[in-house]
Amino acid sequence: LGQIPVTEKSKILGIDPGSRVVGFALIGAIKVKPVSPKDWVVLDVGVIRTSTELSMPARLGQIHGAIFDLLSEMAPQYAAIEKAFHGVNAGTALKLGEARGAIIAAFSRRSVPTLEITPAEVKRIIAGNGAASKEQVYQALQALLGFERGRLPLDASDALAIAYASALARLGPMGQAFTNVAKKNPKRS
């Protein structure tokens, strides 16, 4: 994970990819040199739902179009997405890969640099444990950001974790410390 240049007006759009539901979260820096979660604010968060009645190619088109429109509307400096992981179910992994492709193509068409991060990196940065459960990541996000217990959709909270983890992994002492640990333990990151 390399460093990224950030100003107080920088925005990162985090995306949790899926073939049926795509989570998104836009965060913005409020300091010239943001180094902690408190230096960022949540600007928008939500989900994009595709129709399960549509064919997979039609859903991919829907996802691509929705992300393309979000990028136009939100104008982020960076877009962050989870790297593909090896799932137990080959069909599910293939559909996720197709959805990621549609999303990354939208990033590319809008010339928005793509930050990729593994699920284990997100969990380690946000919850302090690369094997944390989704609930533990959600609770850690609550503690870091101080938002109320009202439930975000799971895909939206995952996108929020992706955006924050991508920012923190590349900025300031926390990001540098994570990068150093990852370099020393390449099989664990």
Name what the model sees in each region.
Residues 1-189:
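Phosphate- and other anionic-substrate recognition elements at nucleic-acid/protein interfaces
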